[in-house]
Amino acid sequence: WLGRYGFLRSEGQATVGDVLRGKTGAVPPFVHTHPTETVRDAIDILREFGVSQMPVVRAEPPVMAAEVVGSVVERALLDDLFNGRAQLADAVDAHMSPALPMVGAGEPVQAAVDALHDADAVIVLEDGKPEGVVTRQDLLGYLTA
């Protein structure tokens, strides 16, 4: 439990936090949206930062893990929009996907690899607070750096 929420650090091996800190580029570490924002707003955020998924949180960061209420995934939004199940003016909470898996910053990189088996991204927690998002692309970048 302590490791999963980022309170403990694995000794002697690369950690998920190392991957997060090694990310390059101009993307803020915790791109997010809120349940009351519109689908259009969420799409604008996805496009602005060039990400394909992001957490939905109840408050402005810093937030605790329990305040992550879901995620926005471009694939799901595109499907809902094209099939008439969503409108651009709808609130995000009506179309959000389940929350992204969470891994502790101090956990070994393998924990992120395992979590990414069934998800496109994971939220990295440090002391119980979401600090950022790591994707498969981030892991590949870390491994080749």
Each language-model region and where it sits:
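Tandem CBS (Cystathionine beta-synthase) repeat/Bateman regulatory domains
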Residues: 1-145
